[in-house]
Amino acid sequence: MDMKKLVGIAIAAVALVLWLRPSESKRIRKVFATASSELRKDGQEGLIVATAKAHALAELVATEASFELDDRILHDVGSGRQLVQQIMLVRGQADKIEVGFTDIVIAFDGERTASVTADVYVRGLSSALGLGGRDARELEAVLEKDKDDDKWRFKKVRLLPVVSM
């Protein structure tokens, strides 16, 4: 095999690896997709399912995290653990919950830190409380890439009121 073919194969191999490897932006978007999926509730769920979802949500939050939610449902939340506890309380009272993130904008503040803004919508229904509705908020978040496992996690989250629908 001549040198030109060998160099061509090497370049093609490097390009393929770089193309198949998920970018950091894609990995951060996946964190939001996972949060949306784990927050979703489509009816009654057992304790095992609820616990698994709580554990999956906790995995998305850095060990030391802060939250500013200023919300009538999720309030007095200062840490990731408190956030998961509050979310599980709300999930226990709701029949259906859907949370989605749109218009996600990511700005990297270094190799291991990213600032993210997004629009978040929440739809819910609780027959026990006689409540149902939709809400939209703006989310400002800082995500940090863990040094041990290279996973992106929420370090700081701030929800701002935008529009009630």
What are these regions (language model features)?
Residues 22, 82-128:
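Surface-exposed, charged secondary-structure patches
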Residues 22-36:
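Ser/Thr/Pro/Gly-rich low-complexity linker/stalk segments immediately outside membranes or between
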Residues 111-117, 127-165:
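Short beta-strand edge/turn micro-motifs at domain boundaries
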Residues 45-52:
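Signal-transducing coiled-coil linker helices
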